C-alpha cells in the first residue's frame, strides 16, 4: 500500500508524526510539500510522476483545499486512476465540503489511524486475491466455481488454497447443494477435508439432497480418520438427516465398534429415533449384537 501525502506549509509540522503513524500501519509513505511540487518549473518535472505507483493519495491542509488547484488536479487524477483519495479534516470549512463528498474520504484526526489500519488490512486481502487469481489463470484454472469444486474432488490442495485465497468460500455448495467439505469426504479426500476445515469450512453444513453433515458422510462410509477430525473441530454428532438418522445410527448400521465408541465419547445421543421409530439402541437390539448394545448403553 503506497500513500502519497500532499501537505501545505501550514501543516508541515504534522507531517513527520503522520508518516510515522502510517508506516506503523504497514504503509509506504512519500510526502510532498504541495507548494514546492506545484511551483516546480523544471523541464524534467511532471506532477503526474508523483502519483504513478500510488494506491492512495492523502491530503493535509491547514486551509480550505477547494481553492487550491493542486488539490483539484491531484484528486482528479487519483479518482480517474481508481485510487483512494483521502483528506484529513482539520477545519470547519473542510468538514463542510460537499462537492467532493462522493470522491474523497474525509478523515478525522482522532480516527485516521484506525482508518489506515483497517484500510491496510483490506488492501492486503485484495492484493492477495489478485495474486491468487493471476496464479490460477497461469496454471490453467479460470476462476469459476465449477473449477474450484472439481479441484476439491480431485484433492488438489495447492490449487484449492489458491481458490480460497482468491475469495472463494469454503462453505460453497455444488449445483446439487452438496457442500465442498462433504464432497471431499464422499471422495475419500481426507487431506482435502482437513484443509477445508482449517480454512473455515462449516463442519455442520448440510447437503441439500439428504441433509447429511460431513460427519454423517464419514460415518456412512466408515471413515474414522475424518470423523475424528470433524469431532475435534466441533462437529455436532447429533445432527439428523432427512430420514432422522444420526451419525451414530449410521455407525451402528455398519457395526463399526471403533466409530461408535468415538461418537459416544463426543456426546452422541443413542436415544434419538429416526423416521422408522428406531434409535441407535433400537438398531443394536434389532441386530441382536451384545457388543453393539453395550457400546450404546442398552
From Swiss-Prot:
Placement of ANK repeats on the sequence: 143-172, 176-205, 210-239, 243-272
Matches recorded under SUPFAM superfamilies: Ankyrin repeat
Database matches in InterPro entries: Ankyrin_rpt, Ankyrin_rpt-contain_sf, Dendritic_Spine_Reg/Scaffold
UniProt cross-references to SMART domains, sorted A to Z: ANK
Keywords: ANK repeat, Repeat
Keyword DNA-binding listed: no
Gene3D superfamilies found in the cross-reference section: Ankyrin repeat-containing domain (1.25.40.20)
Full protein name: Putative ankyrin repeat-containing protein TP_0502
Annotated organism of origin: Treponema pallidum (strain Nichols)
